[in-house]
Amino acid sequence: MRKLLIFLAGLAVVIAVAGETILPRWAHDTAETLLHEAGAEEAETMLHTSPGVLLLFGQIDDISASAKGLRLGQLRLDRAELRGADVRLDAPALFLDRKVHVKSAEELKLTGTVSAESLRDLLARHVDKLDNIEVALDEEGVHATAQAKIFGRKADILLEGKIVEEPDALFFHMTRFDIKNAAFGKANIGDFFGDILITKLSALPLKAQIDSVEHRDGAVVVRLSCRNPR
């Protein structure tokens, strides 16, 4: 019995030490690895849980992370900031499948900043008739100029739009489409461009809601938060 008690006491010490040293380092490295796998070119994370052994059950008391190049659906975020408190992850999915599923959180917010270059890349990928795309951003929205061949003639295109939210998705929505220097009469703009789905919220690793989309000079800021706080 005495040997068993000594063994159990030693095991408890090992678990306690691992919980305060090995597990936090492993969790930190895993978080940064997952951010890189999600497209981040640079990533920094800080997380804290006490006692540390609770990390084995997916419990994170506080987390903050910043990343460059993280992808939100079809958009590259030039900067992404994540803040969370009392976050509970699906531990089996994290450890066995390396997938992040948020079960609950007292607070979990993501702020992403989108540049003109990111929106230019979005338009270039989804509108194959447009060339030489240039994009500018201000408080009114997205302003783009481009060129396109329409009915064999080169035309100058002026396109405007906004990133808009719906209850279950984020879109790029066109608000203006002008064609200049094209002697073919009125064009059907639906043939050349339509709304672009950026992401469905159901595709994100947490049940999220879009809090706001703010168009600024030189950037668009998108804010999301966990939809089912405890």
Locations of the language-model features?
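N-terminal amphipathic/hydrophobic interface segments
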Residues: 16-50
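N-terminal beta-strand/beta-hairpin edge segment
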Residues: 40-133, 137-150
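Extracytoplasmic/luminal low-complexity segments enriched in Pro/Gly and acidic/polar residues
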Residues: 184-230
